[in-house]
Curated annotation (Swiss-Prot):
Source species, domain of life: Bacteria
GO molecular function: unfolded protein binding
Gene3D superfamilies found in the cross-reference section: Skp domain (3.30.910.20)
Cellular component terms (Gene Ontology): cell outer membrane; cytosol
Subcellular location: Cell outer membrane
Coiled coil: none
Main localization category: membrane
Family listed: Belongs to the Skp family.
GO biological process, one term: protein stabilization
Provenance organism: Pasteurella multocida (strain Pm70)
Sorted UniProt keywords: Cell outer membrane, Membrane, Signal
Protein name: Outer membrane p25
Pfam families: OmpH
Length: 193
């Protein structure tokens, strides 16, 4: 019985202390996605990346157009040989027809091989471009995220918050605990530092 009383007393003491500790916690939340989407520098960063990679995009687009033109020209060349053979076939011996068919097949294979090399080289350039763009985008995103984090820290310190959570981790919170707009207002000042 004495053990039960001690356990009960200890449980009440712990519950009372933890509720006091919780009462001193000042917790807020933010919408990280909203802050990122509405970051003052986000549009400028997108334009900067577009400008930085514009020449490469134009070069890749021109290269793709050139390849498409070469494919069309190659098909026309082979089709012209086939049409000529069909036109001349009634006048030719079967050995001559077979020889011209082999020439057409050889030409078609040669053209296809040349096109495949061009397409492979183009695909490698596209892949390299995509990797480079993704790397730069990650670098710029990290800068935006850092500025958001700095703004969150600034607002949390100013308003004496001991804990700031992202809204995805919050099941319920009063709207007064949402400091997203306060953080958004601080971001440009944080960028200027």
């Amino acid at each position: 019985m004495k053990k039960a009383v001690k356990v009960t007393a200890l449980s009440l003491a712990l519950a009372f202390t933890s509720s006091l500790a919780m009462a001193t916690e000042n917790i807020a939340f933010i919408s990280g996605d909203y802050l990122f989407q509405n970051h003052p520098d986000r549009k400028m960063v997108a334009e900067k990346l577009e400008s930085e990679f514009k020449a490469r995009v134009e070069k890749l687009t021109a290269n793709k157009k050139s390849i498409d033109e070469k494919i069309a020209a190659s098909q026309k060349k082979v089709e012209a040989k086939v049409a000529a053979l069909q036109k001349d076939a009634p006048k030719l011996r079967s050995a001559d027809i077979k020889k011209r068919e082999e020439e057409i097949n050889k030409l078609g294979n040669s053209e296809q091989e040349a096109i495949n090399k061009l397409v492979t080289a183009h695909d490698e350039e596209v892949s390299k471009y995509q990797d480079d763009y993704a790397k730069r985008e990650r670098e710029e995103t990290a800068k935006l995220v850092d500025s958001i984090q700095n703004a969150v820290n600034t607002v949390a310190r100013e308003k004496n918050y001991t804990l700031v959570l992202n809204e995805g981790a919050v099941v319920f919170a009063a709207d007064a605990k949402n400091i997203t707009e306060d953080v958004l207002k601080v971001i440009p000042a944080t960028q200027a530092k």
